[in-house]
């Protein structure tokens, strides 16, 4: 099995990159691909760049050029579930766009035309994520809906909009729905496993930039355990 792993930013993939044996790096269309073995498994680690277009381009190349069998999306996310704290893990059951609106044509809010309203994460990959979680000491995780948009959600108004239209949302970020839609169109299984870097409506002593390395450490640990279980 060849495992595709996607992170948007250098900070989100750096720990995983350091652990790859036989590392080879290529760049195409602004996307950086690191290939080799991780914990004995064949992997392709993609640094896609930030946002949905970059993520869709990178995921397309990951699947079409590198022929990965599964896709794991890692990195950071903003927490919307009240039980979440910095460093906790979120596991997708489904992913939706929060900034798509073609409701004038009878679609649901967040549903892109001619696409499903939600992109379901693969059941087997979710089970692997759950098993990996049991190997992490005292790590809290929440499973559920992750929403994506091309905006860093930091205003009360935008938070309220997302909550009103997607009341079950547990976290938001900027790439997962594009990755999920691309995987859907290629019939490639995916799951999103991210760590919380900030939480809506909660004060934090650290800024997003300060906590990002810690979130990356948490999500990378989870991914490495999943890779070991998948190989």
From Swiss-Prot:
Gene Ontology MF terms in the entry: adenosylhomocysteine nucleosidase activity; methylthioadenosine nucleosidase activity
Pathway(s) annotated for this protein in UniProt: Amino-acid biosynthesis; L-methionine biosynthesis via salvage pathway; S-methyl-5-thio-alpha-D-ribose 1-phosphate from S-methyl-5'-thioadenosine (hydrolase route): step 1/2
Catalyzed chemical reaction(s): S-adenosyl-L-homocysteine + H2O = S-(5-deoxy-D-ribos-5-yl)-L-homocysteine + adenine; S-methyl-5'-thioadenosine + H2O = 5-(methylsulfanyl)-D-ribose + adenine; 5'-deoxyadenosine + H2O = 5-deoxy-D-ribose + adenine
EC number(s) on file: 3.2.2.9
Tagged with keyword Thylakoid: no
One GO term describing the cellular component: cytosol
Leader sequence segment: none
GO BP annotation list: L-methionine salvage from methylthioadenosine; L-methionine salvage from S-adenosylmethionine; nucleoside catabolic process
CDD domains named among the record's database cross-references: MTAN
NCBIfam families the record matches: MTA_SAH-Nsdase, PRK05584.1
Name of the protein in question: 5'-methylthioadenosine/S-adenosylhomocysteine nucleosidase
Organism name: Aliivibrio salmonicida (strain LFI1238)
Gene behind the chain: mtnN
């Amino acid at each position: 099995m060849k495992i595709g792993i996607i992170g948007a930013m250098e900070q989100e993939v750096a720990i995983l990159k350091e652990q790859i044996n036989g590392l080879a790096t290529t760049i195409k269309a602004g996307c950086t691909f690191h290939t080799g073995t991780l914990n004995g498994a064949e992997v392709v680690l993609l640094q896609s760049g930030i946002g949905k277009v970059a993520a869709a381009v990178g995921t397309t190349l990951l699947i079409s050029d590198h022929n990965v069998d599964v896709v794991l999306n890692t990195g950071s996310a903003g927490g919307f579930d009240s039980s979440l704290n910095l460093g906790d893990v979120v596991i997708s059951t489904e992913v939706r766009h929060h900034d798509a609106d073609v409701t004038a044509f009878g679609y649901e809010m967040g549903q892109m035309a001619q696409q499903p309203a939600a992109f379901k994460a693969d059941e087997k990959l979710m089970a692997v994520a759950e098993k990996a979680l049991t190997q992490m000491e005292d790590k809290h995780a929440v499973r559920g809906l992750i929403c994506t948009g091309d905006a860093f959600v930091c205003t009360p108004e935008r938070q309220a909009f997302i909550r009103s239209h997607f009341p079950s949302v547990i976290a938001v970020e900027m790439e997962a729905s594009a990755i999920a839609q691309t995987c859907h169109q290629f019939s490639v299984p995916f799951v999103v496993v991210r760590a919380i870097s900030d939480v809506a409506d909660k004060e934090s002593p650290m800024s997003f930039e300060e906590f990002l390395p810690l979130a990356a450490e948490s999500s990378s640990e989870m991914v490495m355990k999943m890779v070991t279980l998948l190989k």
